[in-house]
């Protein structure tokens, strides 16, 4: 059996130490904008959670602790790239120029709140676990056929890796070499199911190897690594 290794990337550790050799080339203004967005989505998340507890929102799924993963990836994309979010991606939408009032509109029960802003390819939030993965693979294939430079990024939790849609999408993207990025936000629990009961694989990232493309493990709380 061929040996394999899954790379782990961390640039900024939990103590604020930065590996300058890996640091992306960002201006001070760009770093400031990223930091401001991290604060904005954190404050939004807490406010929306409070509103839900007050009965002012019907449902709301928090993303506390996952801000860097969503903001960092959003800043790395172009507006014309596709994103396929899950229910825990309100911060991602805001970072992708989705008006806050519309995000609250959606969580208040009005699906029109998910209408993508002009010139930004934000697809609607997927509530069923893992269904957005096949949509993302399809969009990536469409971009390849059209010859554009767009990429398709789909967001999901580790629980989605136990779903059939996930495997179909990964296999399709691998076979046809579609420009898709499968971004798993592993928060260690799929609602109530712990990570250890989802898979026997040592990492989620290594699943990519079986489908013929690269997988990398990244510190999701390190915005620069993301």
What does each of the following model-derived ranges do?
Residues 224-226:
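Structural signature of the thiamine diphosphate
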Residues 3, 10-13, 36-50:
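N-terminal glycine-rich anion-binding loops that anchor highly charged ligand groups
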Residues 26-29, 33-34:
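Positively charged, low-complexity intrinsically disordered leader regions
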Residues 1-24:
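Charged, compositionally biased N-terminal leader segments and the immediate start
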Residues 88, 185-188, 220-221:
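Short, ordered loop/turn segments at secondary-structure junctions
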Residues 170, 180-182, 186:
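A positional/architectural concept
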Residues 179-180, 214:
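Short, proline-centered helix/strand-breaking motifs
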Residues 43-46, 50-176, 194-200, 205, ...:
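Cofactor-binding active-site loop characterized by glycine-rich and histidine/acidic residues
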């Amino acid at each position: 059996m061929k040996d394999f290794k899954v790379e782990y990337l961390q640039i900024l550790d939990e103590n604020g130490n930065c590996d300058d050799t890996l640091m992306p080339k960002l201006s001070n203004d760009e770093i400031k904008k990223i930091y401001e967005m991290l604060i904005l989505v954190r404050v939004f998340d807490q406010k929306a959670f409070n509103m839900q507890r007050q009965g002012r929102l019907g449902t709301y799924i928090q993303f506390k602790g996952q801000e860097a993963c969503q903001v960092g990836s959003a800043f790395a994309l172009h507006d014309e790239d596709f994103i396929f979010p899950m229910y825990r991606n309100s911060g991602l939408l805001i970072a992708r120029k989705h008006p806050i009032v519309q995000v609250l509109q959606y969580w208040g029960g009005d699906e029109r709140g998910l209408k993508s802003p002009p010139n930004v390819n934000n697809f609607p939030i997927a509530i069923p676990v893992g269904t957005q993965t096949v949509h993302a693979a399809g969009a990536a294939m469409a971009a390849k056929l059209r010859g554009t430079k767009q990429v398709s990024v789909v967001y999901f939790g580790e629980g989605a890796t136990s779903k059939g849609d996930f495997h179909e999408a990964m296999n399709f993207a691998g076979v046809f070499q579609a420009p898709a990025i499968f971004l798993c936000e592993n928060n260690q629990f799929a609602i109530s199911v712990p990570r250890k009961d989802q898979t026997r694989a040592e990492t989620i990232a290594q699943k990519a190897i079986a489908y013929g493309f690269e997988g990398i493990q990244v510190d999701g709380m390190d915005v620069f690594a993301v």
